[in-house]
Amino acid sequence: MKLKFTKMHGLGNDFIVIDAINQSVSLDPATIRRWADRHFGIGFDQLLVVEKPGESGDFRYRIFNADGGEVEQCGNGARCFARFVRDHDLTRKNTIRVETACGIIMPTVEENGEVSVDMGIPRFDPARIPFITQERALTYPLNVNDREIEISAVSMGNPHAVQIVPDIDLAPVTSEGPAIESHPFFPEKVNAGYMQIVDRTHIRLRVFERGTGETLACGTGACAAVVSGISRGLLDSEVQVTMRGGNLRIRWEGEDQPVWMTGPAVSVFEGTIDL
């Protein structure tokens, strides 16, 4: 049996997107890992699945990392998801109500082809991240590889640990990122973000993603970094986030308000693969 897919990317964070409404799809972790292999498979950071919704959305959005594990949220993927359902005539709406494992998101396809996404309200309560600590704080000490670092912990539907560094080009992303990802204080693992503040409206960012490794861009990581910077009084409410794959615009008006992310979503090619 052959399965149709579309290869897409958001700032180099790449995906395959599968329509599970108009074709039968059955996935398992071993199959996803095989397809994710960049030498023997298709190659991607995440696999995105478009499904019929429950009662509250237009579509249901499922996300699987390259290691085969299902995760709650992916910001760059959300933009690609929205472009996919529009480009494949699954909807004519500009603003789409999408069900995810962590709640409803509302992507809007703009006239210029970019996609803006209401990413929901960030969570700082340690129990909801989840993060093991005695009480909520702006920053937390974390012992990693025999040194203490200072992080902010926030959930954007998935957990993030964000630290400020003087120069992200020199940050120990690949050597330290895996230790943060698997730190015992994060029982569901965590995405490790490294943020360099250029000024109050501009940051540079690298992210070691849970279950994937470092990617060229991370949408939820950009949201988490900006939210942590605003919470600490270091950033304004609208910030440009520069990652190795390109730029996102993130806007957040403060606690109990949703985070808005705007950026590109690009289709690369369509193909079929044997199940």
Curated annotation (Swiss-Prot):
Keyword Phosphoprotein in record: no
Gene Ontology molecular functions: diaminopimelate epimerase activity
EC number: 5.1.1.7
Catalyzed reaction equations: (2S,6S)-2,6-diaminopimelate = meso-2,6-diaminopimelate
GO CC terms of this entry: cytosol
Family as reported in the entry's similarity comment: Belongs to the diaminopimelate epimerase family.
Subunit structure: Homodimer.
NCBIfam families per UniProt: DapF
Name of the molecule in the record: Diaminopimelate epimerase
Source species: Nitrosomonas europaea (strain ATCC 19718 / CIP 103999 / KCTC 2705 / NBRC 14298)
Organism lineage string: Bacteria, Pseudomonadati, Pseudomonadota, Betaproteobacteria, Nitrosomonadales
